[in-house]
Regions:
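A short, charge-rich alpha-helical start-of-domain segment used by transcription regulators
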Residues: 15-39
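C-terminal edge and immediately downstream basic/flexible tail or linker adjoining helix-turn-helix-like DNA-binding
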Residues: 1-8, 17, 125, 139, ...
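Arg/Lys-rich amphipathic alpha helix in sigma70-family domain 2
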Residues: 67-71, 81-101, 116
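DNA-recognition helix of helix-turn-helix
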Residues: 84, 88, 143, 155-179
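Sigma70-family region 2
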Residues: 19-20, 43-46, 56-74, 93-94
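Helix-turn-helix DNA-binding module
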Residues: 9, 125-136, 144-161
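Structural recognition of an alpha-helix C-terminal capping motif at a helix-to-coil junction
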Residues: 39, 53-60, 73-85
Length: 182
C-alpha cells in the first residue's frame, strides 16, 4: 500500500511543479508517460511521424493547459484524454475520418471471447489493420472506454454510426480471427 501512496504523492508533486512551469518536472512527466501515450497515438495513427508529432503536440498541450487539471481524477487519464483528442484532430485534419452507417449485427461476445486467446501484440496488429473509421471507434469504445454518445460527439457523427462502426470493426476482427483459427 505504501507503493500506491508513494506513487500518488509523486504524481501530485509532479503536477504541482508542472503548474509552476518547472522544466525538470515537465521532463519527468514526459519520461513517465511518453511510452504509454505513444501507444495511444499509435493506436489511432499507426507508427510513424504523425504519431510522434501528435505525441509532442499533446504534451505541449498538457503543459500549457496543466492549470485546468483539477487533481480530482487520474493525471494519466487526463493526459490520455488529451492524446486521444489530439489524435482525432490530426485524423480530421488529414481528412481521413470517413464513416458509413450500416449495422451488421455481429455478436459482441463471440469476438471478445476470441480475443482472450490472442497475445496483446497480435491483437494490436489485427486492430491496426482495420479501416480507419472502424479502428477509431473500436479504440474509443473497447480500449478507451467511451460510450457511443461520447464517441458520436467527439467524432461529429450520429450515435448510430458509432454503433455500426463498432459492429463492423468487430465483424472484421471476427473474420480475421477465424482466418487465424482462434
Amino acid at each position: 500500500m505504501t507503493h500506491i501512496f508513494s506513487s500518488q504523492t509523486i504524481e501530485r508533486e509532479l503536477v504541482q511543479a508542472c503548474k509552476r512551469r518547472d522544466r525538470k518536472a515537465q521532463e519527468a512527466t514526459f519520461k513517465r508517460f511518453a511510452g504509454k501515450m505513444m501507444a495511444v497515438c499509435k493506436r489511432y495513427l499507426g507508427a510513424g511521424p504523425l504519431a510522434e508529432d501528435v505525441l509532442m503536440e499533446g504534451f505541449m498541450k498538457v503543459f500549457t493547459k496543466i492549470d485546468l487539471f483539477q487533481e480530482q481524477g487520474s493525471f494519466e487519464g487526463w493526459i490520455r484524454r488529451i492524446m486521444v483528442n489530439e489524435a482525432l484532430m490530426a485524423l480530421r485534419k488529414e481528412g481521413k475520418m470517413k464513416f458509413q452507417d450500416t449495422d451488421f449485427g455481429y455478436e459482441i461476445g463471440q469476438v471478445e471471447d476470441a480475443y482472450m486467446n490472442l497475445q496483446v501484440e497480435e491483437l494490436n496488429k489485427l486492430i491496426e489493420s482495420l479501416p480507419l473509421g472502424y479502428k477509431t471507434v473500436f479504440n474509443l469504445y473497447a480500449i478507451e472506454g467511451y460510450n457511443h454518445q461520447e464517441i458520436a460527439e467527439m467524432l461529429g457523427i450520429q450515435e448510430g454510426t458509432s454503433k455500426s462502426q463498432l459492429s463492423r470493426a468487430r465483424g472484421l476482427l471476427q473474420q480475421k480471427l477465424n482466418k487465424l483459427h482462434v
